[in-house]
Amino acid sequence: MKRIHLCVLAGVLATACASSKPDYSFLTNDQWAAELRKRGVDPQFVSNPLTSTSDMKETAEQLARPGGPGGPVEKLRNLQSGLFDETQFPFRYQNRGTFTAAEAFYRREGNCLSFTNLFVSLSRSIGIGTKSAFVTRRIPTERDGDLIIVNTHVVAVYFEGLPKPYIFDFDRRPHERVEDAKPLDDLWVTALYLNNRGADELRAAHPEIATRYFEYATRLAPEFVPAWGNLGVARRRLGDLPGAFEAYRRALERSADDPTILGNLASLYRFVGKESEAQAALAAIDLSRATPHVLVVRGDLELIKGNVSGALRLYKRARRQAPATADPWVGMARAELARNHPERARNYLERALTLEPNDPSALAFRQQLEEANRRARNTAK
């Protein structure tokens, strides 16, 4: 699938933390393993994403300079600055590659989630109680064929005794300013780690491994909708269509108008020959929440229905959100060809292939366009 981040409302964080439920934050390794077993997850097959080592504590003390002036926030700022300074901490940031905090520390590489978990683990090792927080803005997705994989983004938060939380963001890519986030306990952090690991395995064409990761994620955080959606994708890849439908049902129980879930459900309905159900699922999508890839899928539906201008509007909207992604450009090319504008279609296609030369949908449309040109030449003869 194609392409799953510093101020937060204090009230939102306080509400998210105020609960009569048990708090699974700041678990020891033994406590963490015991909680996993209670939920049917074998800790022998799952690494604790927040575990620290003595080497990590030593590095944290050096970067945060806890012996110097300043309180916890000052130390956290120093720690973040040190992690961003390649002369102090060489680190290769990558969009993919989900590691535990310890793995990211020793490998000196990882994605946003890995980097955030590393920061949380390092700060906890020197006695500062930070948490990871799930960003609740539009969730990033990736498209693979006719399915959409959901990624997640987290930040680190610290708000002990403070009127307003401090947010530490480790996504090095351009992105929207974080306006809302949900603090996570250690089981939720593990679920996010497993969800991202599952997405990595799906990209590597290992759906059986991905399925196990997603199933574990849903056991640790049953309300985590993206994990249910990704479980549906993985089960479909394995040919378990009833299991895929069940995963999407569980997701929609928790978020009835989730655009990505509805888009993948529509794809599954279409795969089994239920076109009316597929169109109903797509029509139920709340376009105000839709990711670029969901907008493209919705545009495809309008194109199939013959609403070319409506499809083109959706493709252009997707392009505005993700101008460096091939999908919207391919959609626009298809719409222009349907409007009998082959030259404009060719220009859009060239733009898509410039952005992503190996994009399957762009390559397939290029072949379609070449065949259309051959037919036109033969007709002219």
What spans do the regions from the language model cover?
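Single-residue signature of alpha-solenoid repeat helices
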Residues: A210, A244, E277-A278, A311, ...
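Secondary-structure boundary elements
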Residues: G40-A104
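Canonical positions in the second alpha-helix
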Residues: Y216-A217, R250-A251, A281-I285, R317-A318, ...
